[in-house]
Regions:
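Helix-rich terminal scaffold detector
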Residues: 1-3, 8-16, 201-335, 339-345, ...
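Short, glycine/charged-enriched hinge/interface segments at domain edges or termini
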Residues: 2-10, 14, 67-256, 399, ...
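Conserved active-site and cofactor/substrate-binding residues in soluble primary-metabolism enzymes
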Residues: 11-18, 32-35, 39, 53, ...
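Structural signal for hydrophobic packing residues in well-ordered secondary-structure cores
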Residues: 24-31, 48, 114, 128, ...
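Flexible glycine/proline-rich
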Residues: 33, 37-38, 46-47, 60, ...
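Structured loop/turn residues at beta-strand edges in well-structured enzyme cores
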Residues: 61, 101, 122, 271, ...
Length: 441
């Protein structure tokens, strides 16, 4: 953390960049582990993966049809079809392949290896399917084919060499780079690893993020509200945001405004946490329980630990906390309790921390420059970086504010796909002025 003496911290106002810098300096990528492919989805590859064998590993058919020699069908037409002797079936997974000689053909299925002697595949639709009639529309089942898999087939069109043949290594040649270190493993990447024969892979695991909200007024959605109560929305929103960032999220039910209860809850969650996120209780009120419970975290018992609470030059999200707890010094980020404040704080500070734990180079949301689309000028407090909610039109290059600047406006946040950034030295923004926007949608 930044080297400010304890007596000065109470009056210090930190910038957004200073706070983020301290967080990222204390958060390090998780240690790599070897995982089975089904468990590796969403994880980050820590080593280059090369292809041990070509993909596909052999020449194979891309169509259901007949494997033929090019010369045998060179003059084929509807009026004068090439009549070939069918010597057998070649299905996917076949071994002991028949050799196709002059005047011969082999029935072949999609994905089946091209038999020796064959130079091309003619789709079944270019033939009579061995029925002696007109053009076929589908391959007959092996048991229903005339004379089993034998007999004759009439081919109505010529084929060029290698027609409808997928060449060995046409997808990825042996020795080529399949996936680079730093790749996030999604379904296509998992499929590629399986296709080249990898059963396990070395990755950084998805961070385990525990989210808990505080406040005796909070009620689980679905329950009946009592006097002075509100539904707990923050823990649901932040857990969803953590999953969206790539983490495994655990949402803990709202904790009452009791410091001992909060400390005990946090201690219980350490066993399954790579990062702890709290929301609420970080301001200057009489019931700001997070600040009460964690401000006095004992560095004597856990050297290097403790949570520091700060005032940031930003709106919304002025009160923030950051530090570590427990014997393993699990990072903890304490966010404000107002819904918009907590979500904006997550995007600015928690999401980059999660991405850093994953070892990813791209920690932040994409950003763009956009012209303000508004009916009137906007005001912003001097000396604070303001984050307004907005909708971004990439084609027009504009951003339109949604709702006001209030930190409780959940409905406006739900309609937004961007955060409009008003710099600290700007107090008035005119329609048409260019501003930076953080793309969150």
């Amino acid at each position: 953390m930044s080297s400010v003496s304890p007596e000065d911290r109470e009056n210090t106002v930190w910038t957004v960049d200073e706070h983020l810098e301290d967080i990222l300096a204390a958060v390090h990528p998780l240690d790599p582990i070897e995982l089975q492919l089904p468990d590796a989805q969403g994880c980050v590859l820590v080593e280059d993966v090369t292809v041990p064998v070509a993909l596909p590993p052999f020449d194979n058919s891309s169509m259901d049809g007949y494997a033929v020699r090019v010369a045998d069908v060179a003059g084929a037409s509807e009026e004068f079809p090439a009549v070939l002797t069918v010597i057998g079936d070649v299905a996917a997974g076949s071994d002991g392949l028949p050799e196709v000689g002059p005047g011969q053909a082999a029935r072949i299925m999609t994905g089946a290896p091209l038999p020796p002697g064959a130079e091309a595949v003619v789709p079944v639709e270019w033939t009579d399917g061995g029925t002696g009639g007109g053009a076929a529309t589908a391959m007959l089942p092996a048991g229903a084919a005339p004379e089993g898999a034998g007999g004759e087939v009439r081919v109505h069109r010529p084929a060029e060499a290698r027609a409808h043949v997928r060449a060995r290594g046409s997808d990825v040649p042996a020795g080529a780079l399949a996936l680079a270190a730093g790749t996030v493993l999604g379904p296509p990447q998992i499929g590629l690893l399986a296709a080249i024969g990898r059963g396990t892979v070395k990755v950084r695991p998805r961070p385990r993020v525990v989210v808990l909200s505080t406040g005796s007024e909070l009620v689980q959605p679905g329950a009946e509200l009592g006097p002075g109560q509100i539904y707990d929305s923050n823990s649901f929103a932040l857990a969803a945001a953590a999953r969206d960032a790539g983490a495994i999220a655990y949402r803990v039910g709202a904790v009452t405004d009791d410091a001992d209860t909060l400390r005990a809850t946090i201690e219980d969650q350490l066993v399954r946490a790579d990062l702890l996120v709290t929301t609420g209780g970080v301001s200057v009120g009489a019931y700001d329980v997070v600040k009460e419970a964690l401000s006095g975290a004992s560095d004597a018992d856990q050297p290097g630990g403790g949570v520091e609470f700060r005032r940031l030059a930003m709106q919304p999200g002025k009160p923030q906390g950051f530090g570590s707890v427990g014997p393993e010094h699990i990072p903890l980020l304490a966010l404000p309790g107002n819904p918009v404040s907590s979500y904006v704080s997550f995007e600015l500070f928690v999401r980059p921390a999660i991405r850093a734990l994953m070892g990813l180079p791209d920690l932040h949301r994409p950003r763009a420059r956009a012209a303000l689309s508004a009916d009137a000028p906007l005001s912003s407090p001097a000396g604070k970086r303001q984050f307004l909610r907005g909708t971004y039109d990439a084609q027009a290059g504009t951003v339109t504010p949604v709702g006001g600047a209030g930190s409780h406006l959940v409905a406006a946040l739900a309609r937004a796909d961007a955060l409009i950034v008003v710099p600290e030295d700007t107090t008035r923004v005119e329609p048409g002025d260019a501003l930076e926007v953080v793309l969150i949608g």
